[in-house]
A protein has these predicted regions:
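Aromatic side chains
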Residues: 9, 59, 66-70, 118, ...
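Processing junctions and N-termini across compartments
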Residues: 33, 64, 104-105, 126-127, ...
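Conserved hydrophobic/amphipathic alpha-helical signal-anchor segments
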Residues: 26, 30-94
Length: 156
């Protein structure tokens, strides 16, 4: 009689391997979501840094006045890009030097400009607050949705 060796895995061994793969996949997917949110925040921060640069270009080309910063097409395009990262939808209709746009998700972008100063704010991803830039050179996170006025034109 000839003995034959049977090689292979039992059903239990296969189920254990599948369970381990599932646990590892859950950990990796959780890390990927954090990385995605961080990438979205970096995109918003860069768009807002570009708003600051564009505001200075508008200032230099508008007889040294910030009044038209919030109605400048390039500024509104950058703010729209920030809004699209968070919401995927929403439209900015900047017809005055002071405006705010809310979206169906409740997040908003705001911009206000006067002759000597300006401020803009956009929401960060995943409800992490807002990123605000202003004419004083400040660029940073704020935790609340601020209302800007002629007497309150900075992010701090």
């Amino acid at each position: 009689m000839k003995k034959t060796l049977q090689r292979g895995f039992t059903l239990i061994e296969l189920l254990v391997v599948i369970a381990i793969i599932g646990i590892l996949a859950a950990v990796v997917i959780g890390s990927l979501n954090d990385a995605r949110s961080g990438g979205q925040n970096a995109s918003i921060q860069q768009s807002m840094a570009n708003v600051r640069s564009q505001a200075e270009l508008v200032y230099n080309s508008s007889n040294y006045s910030y009044t038209s910063v919030c109605t400048d097409q390039r500024v509104t395009d950058l703010l729209q890009a920030s809004l699209d990262v968070v919401n995927g939808t929403g439209a900015i209709n900047a017809t005055s030097p002071a405006w705010s746009t809310s979206t169906p998700s409740g997040r908003s972008v705001a911009c206000q400009s006067l002759d000597t100063e300006w401020v803009a704010m956009a929401p960060l991803a995943a409800g992490d607050g807002f990123w605000c830039v202003d004419s004083t050179g400040f660029s940073g996170a704020t935790t609340t949705d601020q209302t800007f006025s002629a007497s309150n034109m900075d992010c701090r």
